[in-house]
């Protein structure tokens, strides 16, 4: 069964200021914790559209949310296609959207999905099992320069060159097939003193490959830009991020959306059309409480940012 500790559960949904008869979107269904809490706040007129590109997540959520089946529509799609999918169903605007950008724990924990550096499995890492690009293709077929780029940009890995060089050396002998082989390569490439600190030595490289396989950052940027255009006045978007790359994208997009155009100084009154359409609902990101961190260590790096469309 899908086990998943929902991070910042109450904060994320409560910050949406849910209207009982509103239309809402869970862009990242996952273990359905946020969806369940949100559905509990809706009356018979309210509705939730829940997105996930992982069929397993949807199948499990249908069981978990069976009591709410008349109030929820499940959509198997990447959240970058959210606007188009909603438009196809006659939905042009919504009251709130939530994102939990963490990889759901079951995907990390299921050995055969190939996400984990703790378990030996085939190199896969696809969120959508129907897509062609896998971690095995990235590791064996991408150029030395491209590997350096993704390890550095997406993993913020200091030893990107050394790891890419060791991958190149090994794959000339035979294809790299498993997560265990990749971990061995990373351990060989990283100097011993560096291996002993900062958690598992494979953490950053695995993150980088996962982001590349699923085009995670491109999808986040595309989806958030479209999400802003879907909001009704007074509507809100809640976004939980887990690493600096996603948080930077979210922060920059939100800052851009809340800025008005450059106007000459000293205008007595700013015309409505020049006022920004959005405002930040939280000045600083909301982070998990000490109590939550004690119960769920995976929440440690979580940050919640919220934006609201201004009623004019």
From Swiss-Prot:
Keyword Cell cycle attributed: no
Enzyme Commission no: 2.1.1.199
Entry's Gene Ontology BP terms: rRNA base methylation
Keywords assigned: Cytoplasm, Methyltransferase, rRNA processing, S-adenosyl-L-methionine, Transferase
Protein name: Ribosomal RNA small subunit methyltransferase H
Family per similarity comment: Belongs to the methyltransferase superfamily. RsmH family.
Sites where the protein binds S-adenosyl-L-methionine: 32-34, 52, 79, 100, 107
Localization, UniProt: Cytoplasm
């Amino acid at each position: 069964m899908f086990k998943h500790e929902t991070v910042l559960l109450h904060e994320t949904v409560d910050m949406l200021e849910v209207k009982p008869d509103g239309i809402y979107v869970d862009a990242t269904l996952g273990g359905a914790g946020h969806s369940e809490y949100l559905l509990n706040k809706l009356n018979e007129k309210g509705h939730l559209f829940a997105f996930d590109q992982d069929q397993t997540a949807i199948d499990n959520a249908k069981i978990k949310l069976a009591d709410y089946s008349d109030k929820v529509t499940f959509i198997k799609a990447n959240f970058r296609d959210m606007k188009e999918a909603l438009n196809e169903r006659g939905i042009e605007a919504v009251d709130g959207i939530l994102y939990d950008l963490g990889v759901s724990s079951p995907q990390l924990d299921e050995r055969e999905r190939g996400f984990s550096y703790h378990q030996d499995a085939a190199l896969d890492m696809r969120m959508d099992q129907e897509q062609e690009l896998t971690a095995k293709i990235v590791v064996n077929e991408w150029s030395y320069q491209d590997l350096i780029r993704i390890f550095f940009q997406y993993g913020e890995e200091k030893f990107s060159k050394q790891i890419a060089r060791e991958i190149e050396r090994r794959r000339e002998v035979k294809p790299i097939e498993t997560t265990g082989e990749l971990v061995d390569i990373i351990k060989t490439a990283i100097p011993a003193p560096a291996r002993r600190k900062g958690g598992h030595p494979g953490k950053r490289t695995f993150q980088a490959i996962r982001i590349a396989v699923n085009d995670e950052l491109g999808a986040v940027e595309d989806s958030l830009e479209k999400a802003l255009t879907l909001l009704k006045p007074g509507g809100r978007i809640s976004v939980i991020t887990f690493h600096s790359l996603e948080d930077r994208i979210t922060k920059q997009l939100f800052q851009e959306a809340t800025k008005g155009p450059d106007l000459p100084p000293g205008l007595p009154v700013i015309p409505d059309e020049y006022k920004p359409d959005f405002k930040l609902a939280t000045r600083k990101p909301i982070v998990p409480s000490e109590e939550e961190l004690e119960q769920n260590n995976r929440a440690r790096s979580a940050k919640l940012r919220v934006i609201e469309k201004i009623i004019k």
